Amino acid sequence: MKTLFLFLQLFFFISSFTASGQQSFTGKIENATPDKPAMDIVLFMFGLDNPVKVGTVDEKGNISIDFPEVLPDTIAPETKEIFSTQLPYALFFSCPDITSVAEGTVVYKGGYFSLSHQNRPWAATLFPVSDIGIIPWLEDRYYQSPIMASFYEVIYCEQNIDLTTLCKESISYTENTIDMEYQYTLRLKKGFNLIEYKIEAIQETGIPDTSPIPSVVTITNADDMDAIRWHAKYYYSQFN
C-alpha cells in the first residue's frame, strides 16, 4: 500500500528575481579525442527538427555554455504547445500529488545536452554528472544499478517558480517496502534552469533481476559547476 506525506509550499512570482545557478559556464569533455571537430551544444527540447543551441565545444573538448535569455523565435507556437508541460512532469523525480499545486506552470523539459555537427545533426549525447559511474543507470534504469552521485538536466520555465517540497512515500514490493524521500529546494527563474538531482541513498527492491532504486534524492538548482564532469557518448566516428 502506498502512502504519501507531502509538505509543500509552491509560490509563483510575477516580478523577476535572481535564481541560484548560472547562465554561462564552462567545462571540458573528459573523454574528448583529437579526431572530433568543433560542434554546437544543443537541446532537442522541441524535437530533432528544432534544436536549441545553448553552447559550443571546440576540437579540444572545451565546453562553453551560454543559455539564451529567451527561446528562439523560430519555434512555432503550435510546436511549443505540443512540448509544453507542467513542472511535475518535467522533473526526473516527481511526487504524484503535486500536480494540482503546480497547476498553471508552463515549462519545457530540456533533458540532456547533445552535440550537433553540420554533417551529423545528432552526433553525441553529453552527460553532465558528478561520477561517470551513474551513466549506465541513466541510460537503462530497469537493468542497471544507480550509485550515490549527482546528474543534471535542463528545464525552461515560462514564469518564475519557487518550490520547496518534502515528499515522502512508501512503496510496497512483494518482499520489501521502500521508504522514499524527495527533497525539493528549487528557485527557478523564467528562462533556462540547470537542475541537480543528487542521489543520497539507494535501496534494493527485493525483486530478482530488478535494479535497486534511489530512495533519498535532493533536487536543487545547480550551483557548483566545477563539480560537473562532462562525458560524451559519440554516435559517429567520421564527420566529413
Located regions from the model:
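Structural motif
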Residues: 22-40
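Short amphipathic beta-strand segments in non-cytosolic proteins
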Residues: 43-52
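Sec-dependent signal peptide cleavage junction
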Residues: 18-26, 236-240
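Long, low-complexity intrinsically disordered regions in eukaryotic proteins
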Residues: 70-81, 85-169
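Glycine-centered loop-to-beta-strand initiation motif
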Residues: 25-29, 53-71
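Bacterial Sec-dependent N-terminal signal peptides
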Residues: 1-23
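Extracytoplasmic cysteine-anchoring/structural motifs
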Residues: 150-240
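Beta-strand-rich interaction surfaces with strong enrichment in secreted/lumenal proteins
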Residues: 52-55, 183-185
